[in-house]
Amino acid sequence: MAPPASTLTAPVTAVPSVRTRGTALVLVGILLVALNLRIAITSLGALLEEVRTGLHLSGAMAGVVTTMPTIAFAAFGAVAPWLVRRFSPGRVVVAAMVALVAGEVVRVATGSTVVFMATSALALAGIAVANILLPLLVRQHFPHRTGLITGAYTVSLTAGASVAAASAVPIADAFGSWRAGLGAWSVLAVVAVLPWLPAVLRGSRAHAATAPLTGRVRPARTRVGWAMAIYFGTQALSGYATMGWLAQLFRDSGYRPQTAGLLLAGVTAVGIPVALAMPALAMRLGSLRPLVLSLSAMMIASYVGLALAPHGGAVAWVALLSIGQGAFPLALVMIGLRARTPEGTVALSAFTQCLGYLIAALGPLVVGTLYEITGGWRLPIGFLIAAALIQTVAGLAVARPRFVED
């Protein structure tokens, strides 16, 4: 059963007005935290060959490095609800960013493979916890602007990932070391801590970021929890598979490597305005069903096009795929829409993302295996279409007006 109405409304009424300086700092803090959530991953991906050479990593160890993010997101994200209950969202965010800074700094200062892996895991732990907290922070501080703020931080996350991927190699070349290309980004993580310090140091009970949450919600015992996790997981599976293999598909269809890379970059570029608009649109519509169905339809149409005419219609398929991947920001805003309380939000966020990233880890692996077995793209794309159909069913279940606390 849902908690009494007084329990549901108290956290929101304690939140300061959007016009106050404290809430403005929280907004800046949310955007800066989001900016850092993929930088440590994409910068390492861009410099993986240089890191392998510098640390003498085997192919197997390099494979572990590339699979660590999804595993870490699932494993470390699970502790976020406990941390928030024991401490507070603001304090946990600061601790997460400190862990990210420590991991980013130490891993570029070591010559040990073991230390590099351990500190990379530390950085990913900070990212994993922050992943879980952002929907909660948006819900607490911007209950009437959830869609707009979710879209804004999704764009910030995407921009950080793209800029780091594009800039890591030039920075490394400019300083003559891959360590500079990885370590330079720790400055941004330090900056992300600053907006949270006034509230955390002051410890004001009136500030929602410093109030520990009480109570416990168990999404694993609810249908909406499982539907959310499956929806998030299948859309992330498609996203990771696309990022890992789309350029290769275009190269196999006859495009030059540079053009294939530009087409892949186009998925991200077109996706930025989609990410900004999708959460706000979700908040304005009376039902989520039209968005779930339209996004899945575009994704499936793109996959069919890639299977039948990857070269001739590449630009159209990229555009459809970019819009279809608007399921990611939609999933983030769904977390807030399917919880009544801050406790429910953080619990649903943790369950959704932990299980979802485990599902997502299968995407590149299964697509790569099917590609290696068949030597073509029809069967891998068939797998992605099946995932999109499952995503649709789960999304329609989430679209039903019910809550994780029910």
Spell out what each predicted region is.
Residues 42, 70-78, 162, 268-276, ...:
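Residue-level signature of mid-helix packing/kink "hotspots" within the transmembrane helices
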